[in-house]
């Protein structure tokens, strides 16, 4: 975005941004205040504990183990603006040495009063053994005081550390979980397990707390509106691969340390693999332009409504009203299947395969969490693979790979590495050009017209020059195509000088006959009810709303970055 246009955005959205920011920050600020209060409470408790220890030691009535300082240490994790995503704070554990118990019956009576008949049978069984056991870990202040006031020599306490997740569900798939031994078992917690145990300062991520909150809020809303089984969205800088937001729903509360076996809770950005449909037509056309086989104005004649491909395989046009003569640009705008197949045949298998590999679609991405899927292997010479891949069928990939591919195609043709870790990089010196000059400029112009003239008009948010491509695909279950849909919209903005890629995916959506669509192009046009269960009426609508909300923040907070 040029400096002049950036200033226009700032002027147009300053008041709106301040209002939205204050409104959406309420929940975030409340969480922060609650978290700070909790940490203060813990610190106060530790101080009180030390006073109790002094008194107890003077009386000789309790035994206290040495304080644990580094045993369970893990570094904090913060977002790009210093907000805590994970925090390690002091806590305390209380245990019993059965061999030191003088009056077991009296001790059980006192503990029964404190715990109100809960866990007493477990405590009784443990007391009949000689081995030390923990009565309770991460004891609350009031409970700790009650236990220490018993003055029983068999009861001892030890300082410990507790891992808190103040944002609860917000970053669950990214941060991941730890086990009871304080070892990472998923997400960032696992991938950087050793580093988190050693570094002194916090681990800084590329994520933005406020943007993550807003995107998740909209995904939850549209998931409900279109009765989707799940949803996902990723916002990434197309020039350096920094991920500002990565949301996958449903999610979970990290503080509960639940074992989740439900496949519906997978990370849909990195772990789920999908046939994504017509978003692949962008790759087919970019491949042809990169090979100098076609240009946006190249015209294809005699485009039939269906073509034969191999034995008993027919490829049909999704729209019977599709014109028989289209330019390459029109094929993308109107999302033509047959036109895309004709382009792919001109490119050929080897060249198109190499192109998809170059932009990161065919290989597993080296990423900052372990939950990343490898794309399904493809036999390019079996049946009609080249033809179906041309319009996004017969090939599975992750949302993360899709975001990377769109970034390379639109950022001038430079390779990028998606990342969650904030680094100090000399971006220009490390960028590697992988596409020919001029490819991005031509593609960006066409992607913009998909939004202004084609299937993504609902994402035409004023002031942000959004470009993109829709994709509607039948979901594959046990190698069989079902009636459920995967609706995806890959968008780039601002298209004249691309900075962000936003991919929104809604899984297994349904039409909503009552929903009111409001076009964002300034026309004021409204429409009631979903005409079709396609990406243009589901994921595009969600993406348009997301850009409308986060746009002012991006235009102000990151204008110079």
Where are the language model's segments positioned?
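Periplasmic/cell-envelope proteins involved in peptidoglycan metabolism and beta-lactam response
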Residues: 1-257, 350-362, 480, 514-561
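Beta-lactam-recognizing serine transpeptidase/beta-lactamase-like catalytic domain environment
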Residues: 6-7, 13-17, 84-86, 233, ...
């Amino acid at each position: 975005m040029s400096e002049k246009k950036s200033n226009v955005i700032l002027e147009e959205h300053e008041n709106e941004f301040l209002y939205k920011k204050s409104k959406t920050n309420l929940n975030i600020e409340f969480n922060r205040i609650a978290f700070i209060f909790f940490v203060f409470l813990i610190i106060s408790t530790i101080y009180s504990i030390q006073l109790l220890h002094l008194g107890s030691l003077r009386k000789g009535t309790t035994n206290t183990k040495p304080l644990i300082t580094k045993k369970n240490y893990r570094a904090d994790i913060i977002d790009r603006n210093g907000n805590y995503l994970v925090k390690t704070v002091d806590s305390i554990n209380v245990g019993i040495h059965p061999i030191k118990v003088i009056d077991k019956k009296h001790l059980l009576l006192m503990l029964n009063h404190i715990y109100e008949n809960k866990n007493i049978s477990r405590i009784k069984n443990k007391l009949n053994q000689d081995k030390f056991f923990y009565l309770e870990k991460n004891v609350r202040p009031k409970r700790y005081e009650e236990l220490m006031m018993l003055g029983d020599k068999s009861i001892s306490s030890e300082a410990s550390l507790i891992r808190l997740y103040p944002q609860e569900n917000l970053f669950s798939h990214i941060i991941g979980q730890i086990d009871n031994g304080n070892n990472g078992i998923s997400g960032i917690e696992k991938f950087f397990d050793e580093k988190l145990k050693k570094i002194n300062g916090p681990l800084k991520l590329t994520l933005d707390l406020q943007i993550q909150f807003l995107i998740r809020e909209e995904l939850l809303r549209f998931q409900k509106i279109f009765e989707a089984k799940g949803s996902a969205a990723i916002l990434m800088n197309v020039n350096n691969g920094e991920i500002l937001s990565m949301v996958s729903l449903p999610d979970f509360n990290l503080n509960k340390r639940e074992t989740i076996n439900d496949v519906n809770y997978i990370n849909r950005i990195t772990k789920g693999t999908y046939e994504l449909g017509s978003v692949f037509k962008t790759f087919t056309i970019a491949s042809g332009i990169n090979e100098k086989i076609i240009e946006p104005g190249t015209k294809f004649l005699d485009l039939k409504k269906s073509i034969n491909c191999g034995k008993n395989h027919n490829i049909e046009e999704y729209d019977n009203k599709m014109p028989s003569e289209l330019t390459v640009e029109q094929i993308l705008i109107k999302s033509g299947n047959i036109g895309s197949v004709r382009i792919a045949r001109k490119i050929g298998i080897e060249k198109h395969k190499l192109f998809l590999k170059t932009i990161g679609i065919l290989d597993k991405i080296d990423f900052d969490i372990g939950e990343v899927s490898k794309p399904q292997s493809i036999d390019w010479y079996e049946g009609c693979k080249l033809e179906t891949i041309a319009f996004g069928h017969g090939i599975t990939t992750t949302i993360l790979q899709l975001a990377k591919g769109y970034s390379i195609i639109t950022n001038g043709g430079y390779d990028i590495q998606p990342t969650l870790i904030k680094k100090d990089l000399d971006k220009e010196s490390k960028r590697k050009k992988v596409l020919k000059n001029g490819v991005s400029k031509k593609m960006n112009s066409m992607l913009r017209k998909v939004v202004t003239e084609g299937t993504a008009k609902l994402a035409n948010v004023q002031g942000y020059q959004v470009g993109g491509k829709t994709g509607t695909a039948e979901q594959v279950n046990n190698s069989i195509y079902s009636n459920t849909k995967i609706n995806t919209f890959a968008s780039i903005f601002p298209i004249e000088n691309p900075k962000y890629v936003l991919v929104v995916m809604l899984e297994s959506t349904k039409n909503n006959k009552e929903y009111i669509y409001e076009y964002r192009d300034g026309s004021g046009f409204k429409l009631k009810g979903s005409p079709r269960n396609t990406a243009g009426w589901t994921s595009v609508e969600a993406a348009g709303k997301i850009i409308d909300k986060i746009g002012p923040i991006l235009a102000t907070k990151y204008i110079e970055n």
